[in-house]
């Protein structure tokens, strides 16, 4: 077992911060189209004693909302990202496949100017329709299967 972290950058300062706190593995957000940056970031992390294992990738709404033909173009891009990550030596890609996404209300502010992501039920408009419309369980699973059928063969 090891200590990992996500959501921090890959600057030398940030990597040294991780090492000082016993973190040996990380994932972060790096442009998945840029193979050279992926490889360089992984090498720089390793030089500081941290293994860059994964990166976060966005899943475009065209995929989660099944908007053809853009969905297939975006899936082609994700397949390219998988290939880049593999060539760069990354273990995987981190993503969130969600039709609705995170439901939030406006941010709240705390001490020292800190910002909190929040959800306050009394401020949430549950009657406002989502762009995805009403989607049943079978349709969601069909969209997930469509995604996985395209990306798993590339990842293997």
Per-segment meaning from a language model:
Residues 28-32, 50-53, 77-81, 118-120:
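Glycine-rich loops and low-complexity Gly/Arg-rich segments
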Residues 1, 50-65, 124-131:
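N-terminal small/glycine-rich loop or linker at the start of catalytic domains
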Residues 35-53:
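Glycine-rich, positively charged N-terminal anion/phosphate-binding segment
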Residues 5-13, 28-40, 63, 72, ...:
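Acidic-and-aromatic substrate-binding clefts and catalytic sites of carbohydrate-active enzymes
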Residues 7-20, 37-41, 73-83, 144-150:
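Short, acidic/polar
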Residues 9-31, 44, 48, 84-93:
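Catalytic domains of carbohydrate-active enzymes, especially glycoside hydrolases
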Residues 2-6, 24-28, 52-57, 93-95:
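Hydrophobic faces of well-ordered beta-strands that scaffold small-molecule active sites
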Residues 64-156:
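Active-site acidic/histidine proton-transfer and metal-coordination neighborhood
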